[in-house]
């Protein structure tokens, strides 16, 4: 089957990009590709044949129909207007046309210098490409909206960061790479007609049902806000901290995008800061809902030329509604509740307080809770708490709440185990795969990708255990 590519972004939004070709790496070679995703997209296996060189995965060739561009956008970074940004090392190669008429961006990260590289070198490093590939695939299999990773290429090109590292490329796929920052760019350039063109593009291709509706812009922004709310709720329930929620890292489609200094909670710490460059804690775990609203307010500002203020405020209210509703639903599922009762939040917050005091492992606590038998006062989870009396008191109230519903243990446990993962991408697991890959051993990279495809399956090995002490102290930065 021949892959078909279109160039809607290039054809319809000429002010938003610079056309250019990728700059290949030295002795580039394919070290991993997403076989499952490739099969779903009917990508010929021959394209992954290492004897053909790095090919499209290393920017050495293009597939028929590809028209590469680097996109321009701006944004607020750490709450401060940063001006023009853009694809400083990534190139949108083309948009794959799928059988249902939708498209999928093929975006090559680490593809070389662009007009938007600023002081950078246009490169990505092996460390960061591995982290992003693992994180985006982990999030996908957790059921959280995200970009996808298709391939990783390594090379003999040295790249200087804090130390000298290995140049690499990642093929990232997404329904769209449209960001809040695209709209900010033209708003601050005082070109509202181009802001409106971006909105028209989004509606035409992603919400075509609203094209001929008079209030299409208001409906569209409401949906952007609601999707953002649901996304943040998913992050909070699974214990994911993005690390760098700048407006240029926010997706119009409500996707998790731009994996940099992210982290999944190990010990439950609501103030967890994943990014060691975030000295003020702006992007700490428990501040993500507020930051997302702030970012939506910045996007709303760009839409004032063609959406009424009242409509924008209603949309921002939709964010709060979507966030709280989805978060509440998901947390009740994690606790095994099938109905909503007025004291559920009290019970949840009491558990969080216990976990915070004890430094309980976030993922393991909820996974172990999902094995609870409501008639049994004993639980393996009890042994993980130092203050057994406090846990016992909470656990008695929890079991009493379970008994208010006519749901047997098997059904409830089944529901809980579908939403409480046994496996998340802990930083130490990613680092172990990176360390091996930097020594030329890709086995752990491949193994970890396979493990992350089944996050809701119990395991009795390193992948499901608490991290070693050194693994809790890993510092992650934006220096990708």
UniProtKB/Swiss-Prot annotation:
<feature type="binding site">
    <location>
        <position position="86"/>
    </location>
    <ligand>
        <name>ATP</name>
    </ligand>
</feature>
<feature type="active site" description="Proton acceptor">
    <location>
        <position position="248"/>
    </location>
</feature>
<comment type="function">
    <text>Nucleotidyltransferase involved in the post-translational modification of proteins. It can catalyze the addition of adenosine monophosphate (AMP) or uridine monophosphate (UMP) to a protein, resulting in modifications known as AMPylation and UMPylation. It is involved in stress resistance and plays a crucial role during infection in regulating essential bacterial processes, including flagella synthesis and iron uptake.</text>
</comment>
<feature type="binding site">
    <location>
        <position position="89"/>
    </location>
    <ligand>
        <name>ATP</name>
    </ligand>
</feature>
<keyword id="KW-0460">Magnesium</keyword>
<dbReference type="InterPro" id="IPR003846">
    <property type="entry name" value="SelO"/>
</dbReference>
<dbReference type="Pfam" id="PF02696">
    <property type="entry name" value="SelO"/>
</dbReference>
<feature type="binding site">
    <location>
        <position position="88"/>
    </location>
    <ligand>
        <name>ATP</name>
    </ligand>
</feature>
<comment type="function">
    <text>Under normal conditions, when the intracellular concentration of ATP is high, acts as an adenylyltransferase, showing auto-AMPylation activity.</text>
</comment>
<dbReference type="GO" id="GO:0005524">
    <property type="term" value="F:ATP binding"/>
</dbReference>
<protein>
    <recommendedName>
        <fullName>Protein nucleotidyltransferase YdiU</fullName>
        <ecNumber>2.7.7.-</ecNumber>
        <ecNumber>2.7.7.108</ecNumber>
    </recommendedName>
</protein>
<comment type="similarity">
    <text>Belongs to the SELO family.</text>
</comment>
<keyword id="KW-0808">Transferase</keyword>
<dbReference type="InterPro" id="IPR054838">
    <property type="entry name" value="adnlytase_SelO"/>
</dbReference>
<feature type="binding site">
    <location>
        <position position="172"/>
    </location>
    <ligand>
        <name>ATP</name>
    </ligand>
</feature>
<keyword id="KW-0464">Manganese</keyword>
<keyword id="KW-0548">Nucleotidyltransferase</keyword>
<dbReference type="GO" id="GO:0070733">
    <property type="term" value="F:AMPylase activity"/>
</dbReference>
<feature type="binding site">
    <location>
        <position position="121"/>
    </location>
    <ligand>
        <name>ATP</name>
    </ligand>
</feature>
<feature type="binding site">
    <location>
        <position position="249"/>
    </location>
    <ligand>
        <name>Mn(2+)</name>
    </ligand>
</feature>
<dbReference type="GO" id="GO:0000287">
    <property type="term" value="F:magnesium ion binding"/>
</dbReference>
<keyword id="KW-0479">Metal-binding</keyword>
<feature type="binding site">
    <location>
        <position position="258"/>
    </location>
    <ligand>
        <name>ATP</name>
    </ligand>
</feature>
<feature type="binding site">
    <location>
        <position position="179"/>
    </location>
    <ligand>
        <name>ATP</name>
    </ligand>
</feature>
<keyword id="KW-0547">Nucleotide-binding</keyword>
<keyword id="KW-0067">ATP-binding</keyword>
<keyword id="KW-0346">Stress response</keyword>
<feature type="binding site">
    <location>
        <position position="258"/>
    </location>
    <ligand>
        <name>Mn(2+)</name>
    </ligand>
</feature>
<feature type="binding site">
    <location>
        <position position="109"/>
    </location>
    <ligand>
        <name>ATP</name>
    </ligand>
</feature>
<feature type="binding site">
    <location>
        <position position="122"/>
    </location>
    <ligand>
        <name>ATP</name>
    </ligand>
</feature>
């Amino acid at each position: 089957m021949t892959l078909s590519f279109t160039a809607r972004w290039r054809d319809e939004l000429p002010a938003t990009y610079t056309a250019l070709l990728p700059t290949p790496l030295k002795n580039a070679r394919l070290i991993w590709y997403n076989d499952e995703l490739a099969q779903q997209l009917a990508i010929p296996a021959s394209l992954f044949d290492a004897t053909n060189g790095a090919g499209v995965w290393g920017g050495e060739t293009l597939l028929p129909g590809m028209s590469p561009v680097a996109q321009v956008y701006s944004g607020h970074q750490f709450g401060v207007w940063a001006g023009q940004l853009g694809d400083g090392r990534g190139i949108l190669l083309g948009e794959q046309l799928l059988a249902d008429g939708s498209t999928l961006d093929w975006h090559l990260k680490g593809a070389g210098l662009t007009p938007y590289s600023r002081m950078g070198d246009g490169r990505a490093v092996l460390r960061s490409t591995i982290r992003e590939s693992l994180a985006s695939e982990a999030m996908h299999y957790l059921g959280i909206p995200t970009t996808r990773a298709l391939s990783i290429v390594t090379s003999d090109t040295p790249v200087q960061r804090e130390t000298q590292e290995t140049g690499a490329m990642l093929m990232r796929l997404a329904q769209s790479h449209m960001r809040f920052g695209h709209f900010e760019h033209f708003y601050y350039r005082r070109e509202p007609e181009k802001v409106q063109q971006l909105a028209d593009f989004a509606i035409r291709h992603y919400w075509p049902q609203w094209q001929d509706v008079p209030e299409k812009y208001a409906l569209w922004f409401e949906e952007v806000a609601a999707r953002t709310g649901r996304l943040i709720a998913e992050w909070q329930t699974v214990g994911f901290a993005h690390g760098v929620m700048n407006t240029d890292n926010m997706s119009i489609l409500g996707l998790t995008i731009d994996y940099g200094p992210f982290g999944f909670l190990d010990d439950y710490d609501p103030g967890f800061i994943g990014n060691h460059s975030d000295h003020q804690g702006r992007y700490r775990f428990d501040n993500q809902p507020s930051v997302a609203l702030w970012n939506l307010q910045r996007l709303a500002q760009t839409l004032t030329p063609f959406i009424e203020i009242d409509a924008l405020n209603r949309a921002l209210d939709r964010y709060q509604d979507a966030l709280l509703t989805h978060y509440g639903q998901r947390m009740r599922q994690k606790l095994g509740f099938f109905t909503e009762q007025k004291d559920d939040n009290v019970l949840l917050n009491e558990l969080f307080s216990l976990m915070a005091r004890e430094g309980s492992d976030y993922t393991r606590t909820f996974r172990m809770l999902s094995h609870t038998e409501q008639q049994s006062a004993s639980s393996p989870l009890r042994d993980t708490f130092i203050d057994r009396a406090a846990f016992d008191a909470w656990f008695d109230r929890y079991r009493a709440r379970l008994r208010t519903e006519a749901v047997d243990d098997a059904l409830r446990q089944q529901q809980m185990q579908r939403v409480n993962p046994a496996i998340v991408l802990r930083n130490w697991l990613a680092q172990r795969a990176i360390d091996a890959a930097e020594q030329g051993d890709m086995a752990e990279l491949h193994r970890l990708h396979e493990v992350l495809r089944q996050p809701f399956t119990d395991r009795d090995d390193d992948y499901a255990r608490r991290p070693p002490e050194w693994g809790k102290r890993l510092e992650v930065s934006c220096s990708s």
